[in-house]
Amino acid sequence: AAGNHDYGYSNISVRRSNYNTYFPVDKNFKTQKIIREAGLNAEGVPTMENAAFEFTSPQGRKFLLLTLEFAPRDTIVAWAKNVTNQARYKDHTGIILTHSYLNSANQHIEKENYPITDGNYGAAIWRKLVQPSSNIQLVFSGHIGKPDDAREHVGFRTDKNAAGKKVNQMVFNAQAMGGGWYGNGGDGWLRILEFLPDGKTVKVKTFSPFFALSPATQQFAWRTAPYDEFEFQMDK
């Protein structure tokens, strides 16, 4: 999902972006098989900043995945709500990817100090889009962090949507690991989710191929703190 540094000259001073220049809707032939809609960016162009994808897992579970721009505008929240409410997706598991949503205290972000005034942050996205839905069950975000503090880069919470289904919400970032904001760019940390065949259990692990590459650092390749290695349950 597009983040604050994808807009304007620095830190979303305006809504203009080169995102569509480098990631146009028709660039990746593999996504052409699963993309269903592209919402309009601030300049009125359908782009990957706001897009809907549909796919089926190897176990047969149907997913609807939506990417949303940084601090999505009301028009985009309405677009996303319209997509998720379509009858053809009523039995899908909805996933939202956005940027600013949860903080490290596992709370929905209320507001941020950026020049734009037309955005919705975590609390508003939850209130306007996620909670009223009957099929959104997963929300993933990034954005947060503190130099060389793994705990301040992550968060997780579970609530219920209007249909009473669990909504598991996760934030994961790594950009200030490995020397701070201008250091090693996150040391390659990845969040791995394994969806088990029972259709409800998801295992979460945190891994760095950067550390795994060398015998001298392989022992640091897996982070195993409770906030980095855990399981959660989804509703079927």
What is the role of each PLM region?
Residues A1-A78, Y89, D149-V171, R191-I192, ...:
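Extended active-site neighborhood of metal-dependent phosphoesterases/phosphodiesterases
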Residues G3-N4, H99, G142-H143:
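Active-site glycine-centered loops adjacent to acidic/histidine catalytic or metal-binding residues
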Residues Y7-S13, T75-V77, S104-Y114, D148-R151, ...:
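Extracytoplasmic/secreted cell-surface and envelope-processing proteins
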Residues R61-F63, K90-T93, I136, G199-T201:
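A general structural motif
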Residues E69-F70, S100, T206-S208:
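A mature extracytoplasmic/lumenal domain signature
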Residues V77-A78, A87-Q137:
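Active-site-proximal segments of metal-dependent phosphoesterases and phosphodiesterases across multiple
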Residues T117-P197:
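Conserved beta-sheet core of the metallophosphoesterase superfamily
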Residues G183-K236:
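A short C-terminal boundary segment appended to hydrolase-like catalytic domains
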